[in-house]
């Protein structure tokens, strides 16, 4: 048995060892790394502005939001307005200390303004004071109501689910 080996001689770089990456860098790859490091620290500004009073929030939003005095026994409210890219949304949050009880939103248009993207086991459309309201929840209780009335969209979400008639009563007091 006769074996023959042939090889060509060239000035080639030695291959990287399998457990070590090749150490070749170009100016473009260094620039890309620098840009990535810079953009990792960039943050989008918060589009929400908090207001000390409802009157200040109404002035900023350009429209009023009528709400119940209390929801689930909670009357402490905070007022916020989102203003971004020509869109405006007025939000009132009911909270007891750090614990949020409910959130009401109103914005011009007919889109869902709830910001709630959860999947609910039950969705039903009901009449609440002459307005068609979509209610979402589970086990016969509701956590989210969304509706339109006139030129505005509304959303009411509650932390602790409530009965459909209780949600309808709250919705009928929101304008």
Regions found by a protein language model. Name each.
Residues 38-142, 149:
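Short, solvent-exposed recognition patches
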Residues 150-175:
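Surface-exposed amphipathic alpha-helical segments
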Residues 4-7:
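C-terminal motif of bacterial Sec signal peptides marking the signal peptidase cleavage site
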Residues 9-11:
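Bacterial signal peptide processing site
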Residues 13-45, 51:
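Low-complexity, Pro/Thr/Ser/Glu-rich flexible segments characteristic
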């Amino acid at each position: 048995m006769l074996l023959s080996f042939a090889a060509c001689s060239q000035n080639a770089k030695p291959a990287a060892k399998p457990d070590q990456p090749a150490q070749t860098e170009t100016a473009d790859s260094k620039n890309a790394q620098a840009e990535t490091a810079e953009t990792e620290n960039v943050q989008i500004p918060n589009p929400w502005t908090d207001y000390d009073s409802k009157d200040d929030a109404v002035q900023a939003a350009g429209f009023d939001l009528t709400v119940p005095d209390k929801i689930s026994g909670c009357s402490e409210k905070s007022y916020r307005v989102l203003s971004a890219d020509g869109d405006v949304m007025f939000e009132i949050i009911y909270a007891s200390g750090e614990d949020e009880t409910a959130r009401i939103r109103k914005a011009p248009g007919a889109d869902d303004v709830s910001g709630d993207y959860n999947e609910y086991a039950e969705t039903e459309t009901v009449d609440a004071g002459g307005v068609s309201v979509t209610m979402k929840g589970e086990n016969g209780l509701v956590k989210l109501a969304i509706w339109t009335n006139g030129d505005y969209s509304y959303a009411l979400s509650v932390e602790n689910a409530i009965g459909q008639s209780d949600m309808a009563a709250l919705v009928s007091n929101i304008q």
